[in-house]
Amino acid sequence: MTRSDTRIAWRTGWIAGAVAAAAFLLAAAGTKAQEKPATPWVAPADARAVKSPLKKTPDNLKAGEETFKENCEVCHGPKGDGNGPTAKTLTIKPANFTDAALMSKETDGSLFWKMSKGRGAMPSWEDQLSDTERWQLVMYIKTFSEKKKE
């Protein structure tokens, strides 16, 4: 290899490294721009006032648990603590349903509205799950903070 070849190889390597570093920095900057603090997610007053039409029964809780496992656990985790396998990839972290202070602010109606409408990575479930399935899910989600109190 001649001296000229060595210089060309060195320049090519240096340029490739600089391009890779610039691409990494641009990607990181783009990610940081998306990591704005989440604005509070509050259901409208009329939605908050809605009461569940279902009674808390073992069958409804079991159905809610199954729906949770099939649709929610991947983000909210098996314990409902917001630490599901995909949670670390999300900019806005999933709700921690074991947090009694957080859950005390949520009415049945607000939880139903939030899961129906979705936001960001949280999908809207109103076209995928029936009203009954979503109310059963609300019922089950509330058990996570109740378990923590015990």
What do the predicted segments below correspond to?
Residues 1-12:
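N-terminal secretory signal peptides that target proteins for export/translocation
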Residues 16-27:
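Bacterial N-terminal signal peptides
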Residues 36-67:
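Electrostatic cytochrome c docking/interface patches
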Residues 90-143:
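Extracytoplasmic electron-transfer domains, predominantly the class I c-type cytochrome c fold
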Residues 45-51, 89-96:
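Short glycine/proline- and charge-enriched loop/turn segments
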